Regions:
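The alpha-helix within a helix-turn-helix
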Residues: 210
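Membrane-water interface segments at the C-terminal ends of transmembrane alpha-helices
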Residues: 31-65, 72-200, 224-249, 253, ...
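Short glycine/proline-centered loop/turn elements that form peptide/ligand docking sites
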Residues: 202-206
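Transmembrane alpha-helical segments of polytopic membrane transport and secretion proteins
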Residues: 1-42, 298-312
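A mid-sequence, solvent-exposed acidic-amphipathic segment
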Residues: 218-222
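Glycine/proline-centered hinge or cleavage motifs at structural transition points of membrane proteins
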Residues: 213-214, 227
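Glycine-rich helix-loop "coupling/hinge" segments at transmembrane-helix boundaries
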Residues: 250-276
Length: 312
């Protein structure tokens, strides 16, 4: 009879290597138990809160004829409201992406007195009711306001006098610049809070290594920093745009609500509801939903391409 060995049949090192191997995606193995229950609850919650209300909006429009639908969503007044809503939202999101990046950079990289106060002020648009924000902005930027009393004449002589920017208007409050101002105010935190964690993980040694290799500041920004920040910057841009597109409370006070000039689509939807035109309001809501989803989908695809291109 052969002697019984005290050593195990398998090498412990081989067993450890097997345990340490990552589980490939789609293998059916889950680290946490209850995946089926969690997935079912997620689908139920998403359907109850998001899909069912949106489906109801689409079903409401199915009761309209094509002539009624086109008359409701393609009138001259509605098309002007589309241009104001989408145009002002894109401009506000672009401004937030630019200045939000600078603000996040300063808050992360430069210690200065009062930095915590400034960091807390970034979240103020989250906590402040939008109606209060609209009233405050109107009081500040109106013709007789603290800021508007000296800024509006300067605006008329500079920006308002340029031929290519005459569509903005010759004043701030009660015109299109006021709409952009309100949307910029409520969307800034989305960009700053999205970029801050990425900037905190970005090591300053990358900039030092770039400078050591002879790169200029502009080359360091465009070839080192921006590729790292691009996905987060696009995410912040998309969130800011989506938030601005559905904004109502702050814009209604500072825009003046002039049809074909400063009227936004959410205000037009409220107007139709007050007139008991539920089908017309639902049709506008569906167009806004499809349009905003298409823009956000394009931004997400661009963000995905940016991440893949950066990895390559």
């Amino acid at each position: 009879m052969p002697p019984v060995s005290d050593t195990p049949d398998t090498d412990p090192r081989v067993d450890l290597e097997i345990r340490d191997k990552p589980v490939p995606r789609g293998s059916g193995r889950s680290v946490l138990p209850g995946f089926g229950l969690s997935l079912g609850y997620t689908i139920f919650y998403l359907g109850l809160i998001v899909l069912i209300p949106l489906s109801a909006a689409f079903l409401k429009t199915f009761g309209m004829t094509w002539a009624e639908f086109t008359a409701a969503v393609f009138s001259e007044r509605v098309l002007a409201a589309y241009r104001v809503s989408f145009g002002a939202s894109l401009v506000a999101a672009a401004l937030n992406a630019t200045f939000g990046l600078l603000l996040a950079w300063v808050l992360v990289r430069y210690p200065f007195p009062g930095r915590r106060v400034v960091d807390a002020l970034v979240d103020l648009p989250f906590a402040l009711p939008t109606a209060v924000a609209g009233i405050a902005l109107t009081a500040l930027y109106a013709k007789n306001g603290w800021i508007g009393s000296w800024l509006e004449p300067l605006w008329v002589k500079t920006i308002g006098a340029l031929p290519g920017l005459s569509w903005l208007g010759a004043k701030i409050a009660y015109d299109r610049p006021g709409v952009v101002l309100a949307l910029t105010f409520i969307g800034l935190p989305f960009v700053v809070r999205t970029l801050q964690p990425v900037l905190e993980e970005l090591e300053p040694e990358l900039e030092e290594a770039s400078a050591t290799l002879g790169a200029s500041r502009w080359q360091t920004i465009t070839r080192v920093l921006l590729p790292e920040l691009a996905p987060a910057l696009l995410t912040g841009f998309a969130l800011s745009f989506a938030r601005a597109l559905g904004e109502y409370g702050s814009v209604v006070f500072i825009s003046g609500n002039m049809p074909n000039r400063t009227e936004i689509v959410p205000l037009l939807i409220i107007t139709k509801l007050e007139q008991y035109d539920y089908r017309g309001a639902t049709a506008l809501a569906v167009v806004m939903l499809v349009g905003s989803f298409a823009v956000l989908l394009g931004i997400n695809l661009l963000q995905k391409w940016s991440r893949r291109h950066h990895r390559i």
